[in-house]
Amino acid sequence: MEEEKNWIVVPTWRIPGRLEKWHSLIKHLKYNTKDLQKACYVPHHKVGWAWWTCSRVIFPLKDEAHLEVQGYWNLTPEKGWLSTYAVRITWYSRNFWTDVTPDYADTLLHGTYFPCFSEGEVRRAIRGEKLLSCCKFPKAHKNQVPSLQYLALTVVSHVRSQGENPTWKQWRRNNRRGLRLARQNSRRNKQGSSESFAEGTNFPGLAKVLGILA
């Protein structure tokens, strides 16, 4: 009697390439800039029996919760013989877990990681003083209804950093800068270079870094 074949079905986000860029950025933000110092990076040779998993990145969150980004390889492609890569993004709490979208994962991450505007910045902006903080993860606010304070502080910080009113092209260029530098850092690591990811850039968000095909 033939043994019945069992399938494991989970929601995943397909990516167009390999995961070196993602691994490189996580290790840089964990060990160099310390922005993700609490995160745990688990490479494929330490995952254990889950041979289809090429890496796990675990982000501890508030209230004993955590976010896990699990990379898969050797998945069956739609056409051809080449392996397909994908990621699964899961949020865990004490009594519940669920898969989440990359946009919502960004919101969860920003609640614990990467600084944002402090409460006193509104008063400093009104008095015309120098802002002492800024948002390093603006992509996390994409699917939220931004407050007037956040919108005003975002405009003020851009205007003062550029010395003039920013155009829409400049705004898009700034948002893409973090992703471009992540790619450059990945190529440097492949070539054995010791140059690191540039400091002071914004985190571009999970979807951008992973190249998810939504």
Swiss-Prot record:
Motif (HCCH motif): 110-141
Coiled coil (residue ranges): none
Membrane topology: Peripheral membrane protein
Its biological purpose: Counteracts the innate antiviral activity of APOBEC3G. Forms a complex with host APOBEC3G thus preventing the entry of this lethally hypermutating enzyme into progeny virions. Functions as an adapter molecule, recruiting APOBEC3G to the ubiquitin-proteasome machinery. Targets APOBEC3G for degradation through the assembly with elongin BC complex, CUL5 and RBX1. Binds viral RNA and affects the stability of viral nucleoprotein core. May play a role in viral morphology.
Modified positions (Phosphoserine) in chain numbering: 147
Record remark: domains: The BC-like-box motif mediates the interaction with elongin BC complex.
Keywords: Host cell membrane, Host cytoplasm, Host membrane, Host-virus interaction, Membrane, Phosphoprotein, Ubl conjugation, Ubl conjugation pathway, Virion
Self-association and partners: Homomultimer; in vitro and presumably in vivo. Interacts with viral Pr55Gag precursor and host APOBEC3G. The interaction between Vif and APOBEC3G is species-specific, which may play a role in restricting the replication of SIV to their host. Forms an E3 ligase complex by interacting with host CUL5 and elongin BC complex (ELOB and ELOC).
Induction of synthesis: Expressed late during infection in a Rev-dependent manner.
Subcellular location: Host cytoplasm; Host cell membrane; Virion
Segments carrying motif BC-box-like motif: 147-156
Protein name: Virion infectivity factor
Region (Multimerization): 154-166
Any single GO CC term annotated in Swiss-Prot or TrEMBL for this entry: virion component
Post-translational modification: Processed in virion by the viral protease. Highly phosphorylated on serine and threonine residues.
Domain of life: Viruses
Misc. comment: Vif-defective viruses show catastrophic failure in reverse transcription due to APOBEC-induced mutations that initiate a DNA base repair pathway and compromise the structural integrity of the ssDNA. In the absence of Vif, the virion is morphologically abnormal.
Residues recorded with modification Phosphothreonine: 98
Keyword Phosphoprotein assigned: yes
